[in-house]
């Protein structure tokens, strides 16, 4: 069997060690004669899996006991609506940063429920960075302050936590578990699983208990209420059990790697060496302000875009898969989440160097 280096933005690469465990356990999980995918979500087997996954994630991120961790369905995009539905309360305004594609979609969704106030707009910089925080327009009152920590399409990542007195809400779909951060600075964090935590179909929400006391908008369906999910411990109905199980295996893998801090150092090395190569090249280019360059999603363009198809074809032939950029931006994108090895990044750099020699 020959596996390729998978640079997909999501669903993304899963650590091989985790895949081997899934393979070994798939038909007979822990000697019960069934797959974990077949057991009842309310049986002791899966309840144990679910509780252990939550404990491990809480430990990895140092999540205080004053926060609930929810394992939900619907993908992160559903959170674009659930956040205002549950957190607006009596407010008419919420603060957003437009930093790229995913924050822009969240803002558009929020307009169905409130007046989203833009603190700043990276469009002014052609989405190559974030305007200086000293220039942000911050109201004194609003229901919450929302931003996307890492924009997968635009290749922008926040190197800091925004300074605000408002309740901080963050979409960490593409970089949760990639570096340590202070959970207590946030009111709510959410992340879909298919970047750093396994399979599409699972979204993790970390929410402070105080926010669960806010009254949802009257039109909010009961199934979309955080408080009800918290009360039922994410078991209102059948959860995505296999995705939850796989996320738990990945949490174990992160612990075995040495924890989030160790992965953060590795992620920094991977990104730094790829950006260093691109910056030295006269053939490849990355337009993002170095301060805001994503460690997870490295976008780049070829000097001659007529060679794009050839680049992708030869990359695939060399075991480097899914490097095509997002349809909205074009170009190339190497997504180097936690599961991408340093060897994979080295292989990409070597291929890019050889391609430049032949076509530059």
Swiss-Prot record:
Cofactor(s) required, per the database record: pyridoxal 5'-phosphate
Signal peptide (UniProt feature, chain positions): none
Pathway assigned in UniProt: Amino-acid biosynthesis; L-serine biosynthesis; L-serine from 3-phospho-D-glycerate: step 2/3; Cofactor biosynthesis; pyridoxine 5'-phosphate biosynthesis; pyridoxine 5'-phosphate from D-erythrose 4-phosphate: step 3/5
EC number, as in UniProt: 2.6.1.52
Alphabetized UniProt keyword annotations: Amino-acid biosynthesis, Aminotransferase, Cytoplasm, Pyridoxal phosphate, Pyridoxine biosynthesis, Serine biosynthesis, Transferase
Biological processes per GO annotation: L-serine biosynthetic process; pyridoxine biosynthetic process
GO molecular function: O-phospho-L-serine:2-oxoglutarate aminotransferase activity; pyridoxal phosphate binding
Gene Ontology cellular-component annotations: cytoplasm
Residues annotated as binding L-glutamate: 42
Source organism superkingdom: Bacteria
Binding-site residues for pyridoxal 5'-phosphate, renumbered to this chain: 102, 152, 171, 194, 237-238
Note on cofactor: Binds 1 pyridoxal phosphate per subunit.
Record's catalysed reaction(s): O-phospho-L-serine + 2-oxoglutarate = 3-phosphooxypyruvate + L-glutamate; 4-(phosphooxy)-L-threonine + 2-oxoglutarate = (R)-3-hydroxy-2-oxo-4-phosphooxybutanoate + L-glutamate
Location(s), subcellular: Cytoplasm
Keyword Amino-acid biosynthesis: yes
InterPro entries (UniProt xref): Aminotrans_V_dom, Aminotrans_V_PyrdxlP_BS, Pser_aminoTfrase, PyrdxlP-dep_Trfase, PyrdxlP-dep_Trfase_major, PyrdxlP-dep_Trfase_small
Similarity comment: Belongs to the class-V pyridoxal-phosphate-dependent aminotransferase family. SerC subfamily.
Quaternary organization: Homodimer.
UniProt xrefs under HAMAP family: SerC_aminotrans_5
Record's function text: Catalyzes the reversible conversion of 3-phosphohydroxypyruvate to phosphoserine and of 3-hydroxy-2-oxo-4-phosphonooxybutanoate to phosphohydroxythreonine.
Protein's name according to its UniProt entry: Phosphoserine aminotransferase
Organism, scientific name: Coxiella burnetii (strain CbuK_Q154) (Coxiella burnetii (strain Q154))
């Amino acid at each position: 069997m020959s596996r390729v280096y998978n640079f997909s933005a999501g669903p993304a690469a899963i650590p091989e060690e985790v895949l081997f465990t899934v393979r070994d356990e798939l038909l007979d999980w822990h000697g019960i004669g069934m797959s974990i995918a077949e057991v009842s979500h309310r049986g002791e087997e899966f309840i144990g899996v679910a509780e252990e996954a939550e404990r491990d994630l809480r430990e990895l991120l140092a999540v205080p006991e004053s926060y609930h961790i929810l394992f939900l369905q619907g993908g992160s995009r559903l959170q674009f609506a659930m956040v205002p539905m549950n957190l607006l309360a009596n407010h008419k305004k919420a603060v957003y940063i437009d930093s790229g594609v995913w924050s822009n979609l969240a803002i558009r969704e929020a307009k169905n429920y409130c007046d989203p106030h833009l603190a700043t707009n990276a469009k002014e910089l052609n989405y190559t960075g974030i305007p200086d925080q000293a220039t942000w327009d911050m109201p004194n009152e609003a229901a919450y302050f929302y931003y996307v920590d890492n924009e997968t399409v635009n290749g922008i990542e926040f190197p800091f936590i925004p300074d605000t007195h408002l309740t901080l809400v963050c979409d960490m779909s593409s970089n949760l578990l990639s570096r340590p951060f202070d959970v207590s600075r946030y009111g709510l964090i959410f992340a879909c699983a298919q970047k750093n935590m396994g399979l599409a179909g699972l979204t993790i929400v970390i929410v402070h208990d105080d926010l669960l006391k806010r009254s949802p908008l009257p039109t909010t369906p009961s199934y979309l209420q955080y408080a009800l999910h918290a009360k039922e411990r994410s078991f209102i109905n059948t959860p995505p059990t296999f995705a939850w199980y796989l996320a738990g295996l990945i949490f174990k893998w992160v612990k075995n790697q040495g924890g989030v801090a160790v992965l953060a150092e590795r992620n920094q090395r991977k990104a730094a060496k790829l950006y260093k190569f691109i910056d030295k090249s006269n053939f490849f280019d990355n337009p993002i302000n170095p301060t805001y360059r994503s460690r997870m999603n490295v976008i780049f363009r070829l000097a001659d875009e007529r060679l794009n198809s050839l680049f992708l074809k030869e990359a695939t032939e060399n075991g480097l898969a899914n490097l095509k950029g997002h349809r909205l931006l074009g170009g190339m994108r190497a997504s180097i989440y936690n599961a991408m090895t340093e060897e994979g990044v080295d292989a990409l750099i070597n291929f890019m160097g050889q391609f430049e020699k032949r076509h530059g």
